[in-house]
């Protein structure tokens, strides 16, 4: 009984961020840090909180000691590298040469390079920072790690930042040591290969939303085109033909007319590549031929295009709420009331217009609600909690429902205006008629693909069937039956 009572109630184990338990050595392992900048301070804070004994090497320890946690020992660089086997090099590339005097003391140790070059430095040097550090200290083992983790993520913990730590190096044991340290700190290590991969890893923090560049340019291009079109119709035409000054509409009214057009076309462009891919597979009779590069890139950017569509739809809703707040709108109401009095009409009520307004506003709210659901489920944490069938149902089925609701919203908004001559200003059709072309083609194509003759064939192709793929299977020689042919 006494033996049971002698056991500690809580074992020396830490809980990782994913819920698993990681053993912590009885004696805290000692880790060295060379550097006293922001990243070095955040790294020291995280290491101390994870149970490591931290020694910080600084050129002026008295001045920087107050910036580090009290449990971290701040001393001169020579003393900091004497005992730890793992040393984080948290200095810039141009300062690597200042560490050459420590080469003898660093021999045989693991150097973890956490630096990132600037865009200019990356273009100037052929070697990555990690490879350059390895060339200066050939007796050391250099591992590239933690360069994609920000100082804030180190301080706040992996729950508030990116959990992945990209690691590359030439020695497996050294990478394993750094990986275990990353796990103890609550991060998820990801092996990126040899040290030659460091150049690619160092380029990651320099990228500015690479997957958003083309969708953003597309959205801006559509906005400029539709804005210019609406400006000609709503502002320029009245000024030239009727000498009416309506330039006050440019900041809000013309923008609000443009936003739904951009959102609607972008939503159509999310589902158009799927239609083109299905048509291409039906034409080829196989799924084993690669799509053209332009279609492949288009398919990969659907998420960004959809989120931009949601963004413009939300702006359209907010701008619409602001329309009654305009001074011009109040003047229009007063002028309408004066005209009603002069016409000696006690009640102004157009049943058709009332129903049209009620219906198209309701459809617009429903479409925005569907887009909101699509945007929420595209968040990685929520998307990862869904299985493939659930995710496909939300993004494909409900997304197509959102496109249908948007089309009905646009049709009820336009009503009969497309057939009225006075709405063709400068012989230009109403803007909504231009936006309807692409969605109607997509809806028609989707309807055709639902026909049994096309639906069954497309399903077979996506399950591996090929139109011209006749595979011959030969039975054993002693078998009574002859040759058999099967289509795969």
Swiss-Prot record:
An annotated GO BP:
positive regulation of intrinsic apoptotic signaling pathway in response to DNA damage by p53 class mediator
Question: What's its membrane topology?
Answer: Multi-pass membrane protein
Tell whether Zinc-finger is among the UniProt keywords. Answer: no
Residue spans crossing the bilayer: 208-228, 259-279, 305-325, 359-379, 391-411, 434-454
Reaction(s) this enzyme catalyzes, per UniProt: 2 Fe(2+) + NADP(+) + H(+) = 2 Fe(3+) + NADPH; 2 Cu(+) + NADP(+) + H(+) = 2 Cu(2+) + NADPH
Q: Which InterPro entries match?
A: Fe3_Rdtase_TM_dom, NAD(P)-bd_dom_sf, P5C_Rdtase_cat_N, STEAP_metalloreductase
Name the UniProt key words of this record, in alphabetical order. Apoptosis, Cell cycle, Copper, Endosome, FAD, Flavoprotein, Glycoprotein, Heme, Ion transport, Iron, Iron transport, Membrane, Metal-binding, NADP, Oxidoreductase, Phosphoprotein, Transmembrane, Transmembrane helix, Transport
What are the Phosphoserine sites (modified residues) in this protein?
A: 11, 17, 20, 486
- Name the residues that bind Fe(3+): 229, 319
Which cofactors is this protein said to need? FAD; heme b
Please describe the quaternary structure of this protein. Answer: Homodimer. Interacts with BNIP3L, MYT1, RHBDL4/RHBDD1 and TCTP.
Q: Which family does it belong to?
A: Belongs to the STEAP family.
Record protein name field: Metalloreductase STEAP3
Say which species the protein is native to.
Rattus norvegicus
